[in-house]
Structures are given as C-alpha cells and as structure tokens.
C-alpha cells in the first residue's frame, strides 16, 4: 500500500541478487561418510544440494571456485526459483563464467558479469553480448540434444514443456525480440518505482539513502559501502560504474519481468521492474573478502569501497574457475589441465569433476517429496529469506539423515526494524523445527545465516545463535518477505507466450503499486483487448 511517506516495500516482489555474502556450500554440507566412501572406493562421492531462491548463482560459483580446496566430489545443484526470468539469468551467468578464456579475457568477463548482474543500464558492448548470448540460448532451449552437447552442465529435464517455451520467450526478448527503448524503458521505470517507494520523501531521497546506509547497512556489517556509490545506485540503478557514467544508457533487459495486473475488472499483462531498490547488489560479493587487506580501515574509514571489493572478488572467482571453463572438463571429460606455460616442467593439475545444475519446475517445492528420486536425496538444503514460507516437513523429508539446512536471514533488508529482524529469526527457528531440523551446536554467531541439521542424528559442532526461541509478534508470524514469491495468479509467464490464467485475478497492494512502473504490454496472445483492458495512463507512461 502506498502512503504519503512511501510504500515501504523497497525489496520488491522479484529478487535479482542475493542479500547475503556468497558461501562455499561444501563448507556448509556434512563431510563425506567414510563408510559410504569405502563402498564407492572407485567412484567419486556426490554432493546433492537443493537451493530455494538463490536467484543469482553466487553460492554455486563460489562452491565451484573453492572446489580445489576439498576432496574431489561431483556436484549436483538443484535450483528452484519462483520466476523463469531468474532461471534465465542463472543460465546466462553460468554461460559467462564458463566462457572460453580465448574468446573473452578475465577482466572483460568480470566487468561484463558485474554490469549484467547488478546494473539497470549497460554499456553498448555489454548489451551486444547479452543479445548474442540470449539469441544462442533461445535456439538451444527447445533442442535438448544440442543443449546437452553445448551446455553439458545444464539440465532442464524437470521443467514443464510450457515453462521451457516461456524460458525461450525470455531469451528472445533479451535478444531484442521487441525493438526500441520503449520495450523496456528502464530509467523511467526505475524513477517511477523510486517515487512510489519514497512518496513525499522523494525530494529528500539523498538524505533517505544516507540514513539507510549509515544507520542500517553500516550498523549491520556493510561498512565498506560508500555513500557515493550507494547514492548513485539509488538514483540510477547503476551499482558498478566501471567506465564514464555517460557510457551507461542501454536498458538491462535481464531485469525485466512480467506480471498480470487487474485494471477495471480485467486482467492486464504488463512488463516492468519489480526488483530491489533499497539494498542493492553490494552485499553478495562486496562486504567480505579472503584478502583481509581489502577490508582494512584508515582513520576509521574503509580504504576500499564495496564496488572495488566486488571487482576483486569476482575476478578471483573467475580465475579460480578457469579449470571448470576448460573445454574438455566442461564437457564432462575430466583430463589434465595444463599448468603454466607451454613446456613447463610443473605437473598438470587434475581437472575437476563435472557438475550439473538442475532447474526444477516452478512451485514444485510442495510436491518434491512425492517423487522417490528426491526423498532423502540432498545433503544440504539452502533457503533464501524470501522463500522461508516454503520450509515444511515435506521439504525436510527430501534431506538425507545428517543433512544440513542453511537459511538466509533478513539482516540486510533496510525496510525491517531490529525487532522485526529478531522476530523473523525466531520464525525461521520455528519453521525449521517443524520441518524436522535442530540448531547446530557451537560455532561462531551469525546474523546473516541460520544453520540447522536434520534432527534425529548426532549434533554437529556448529550452531547459529541468531536463531532464538520465542513467539514473534503477530505481524511477523508469517514471513515478512513472502512478497518475493507473489501468488501464482499475480505472476505471469513471459509476455511473448502463454495465456492469462482463467481464474479471477486479485489485485494485491503490491500489484496496485506496481501499476506505476509497468510499461506498455506487448502484442500477442496475452495482450488485452483495447476496448476493455486499456492500461491506465500511469502504466503506459510512468511518472517522469
């Protein structure tokens, strides 16, 4: 609901980046069982991980980059999102991370990743890369044989046929299926969303952003985010300005999503930006670093900004992933990766085991336990803060005995007060206990993640005191971030394909607010009839 002081919903209803630092999933998972390892002496142990709402692949990338530090394991990542645009971004990001180094150097890959992942506006060369990759992926998705040959790490077998068709439509839109800037006027949509969020505080938006940064994000552990970069992102949506500001003017279509809105009793298909405008993409790679010198301070101020730390961390991430990007290793054929220059006498490092990313059907969290292939299958379950409401006993049954659960907390959501954060942590503990998990014992306290193990087994030696017992206030008995998974009738498949659902569509307060930032709905089977479903003027032309 929009008030004179703003809507207070800066996180939005669609997640494009995570609100927690990237973690190594091997460090969070239980160690390999020596008995099972002895039984499979000649086979590589497997690690099966189920991730709900990880949105940007940061945990998967860090896990692959750190794989050389652990005993060899074959990874199976099962990813469940609440919208197909997030699935498409996963695929695009991994395609970029595994790009042949001879085609794209390390620095170019790192900069392209940062802009596509976290900027609302792109440089023309980066936009051209997105169009080319999206066009390639649009041709691969409907052809399973070619997809398996060119992207052997990707599995779309669990998606429904209509979801694959919709995924193809997403890639075609990214590839420029609808020409012209009006197809997705990002700058106008961003400003409209900002006005709706801030209300009467819009003219004092710099003061609001400074307050949110210094009194909330800095106090919660993100002190390296600089005022200048945070203001720039809040104003324009450009988080990582790696070139002159004038170079960023092409809308980033990977941040577009479609929704069905109700207008005068009719369903209207609209495309807009409904992502985060409050916290920003700085947390995932920009507030922690393996190199402690990046986090040092001088006169009480950090010497590096979150943007600089993110650049360094992503470059190191892609450098460590070079073995995964080796052509033969990426095709699932482990071999020796040549070390050093040609003719080097150093022994070659073994190629890593192949990995597979399995994308599950949307809304399948409540039905996974019906399939025997998922029962007790996963050693680790990861749940993002916006998907906590999906945590249930049925989902817990899919975790193997002794398995672990890691839940992202709402630490970096600036719209939540401290008492709401504590209530949310308590609610997470209750849901985890009801799902059959118990808090881990010992370990360093964390306000960012809550960690549990599958109850009924010996307690491992880690605990996250961030999860406390107690009854939360009534207003937070339901997870406050449930808006990140909008009801199925309020969410639409990509606008180029499919038909609106036959059920009546209820317009939530989030949907009412979203009318201000939606752009002109495209023509096609989902486009409404002009005489009955005309989009209101503020939808066609958001507030300038």
UniProtKB/Swiss-Prot annotation:
Keywords: Cilium biogenesis/degradation, Cytoplasm. One of its GO terms (biological process) is axonemal dynein complex assembly. Residues 522-536 have a biased composition (Polar residues). Residues 328-350, 448-544 are annotated as: Disordered. The keyword Cytoplasm applies. It holds the Pfam family DUF4471. The keyword Membrane does not apply. Its main location: cytoplasm. It is found in: Cytoplasm; Dynein axonemal particle. InterPro entries: DNAAF3, DNAAF3_C, DUF4470. PANTHER family: DYNEIN ASSEMBLY FACTOR 3, AXONEMAL, DYNEIN AXONEMAL ASSEMBLY FACTOR 3. Required for the assembly of axonemal inner and outer dynein arms. Involved in preassembly of dyneins into complexes before their transport into cilia. This is Dynein axonemal assembly factor 3. The lineage of its organism: Eukaryota, Metazoa, Chordata, Craniata, Vertebrata. The gene is DNAAF3.
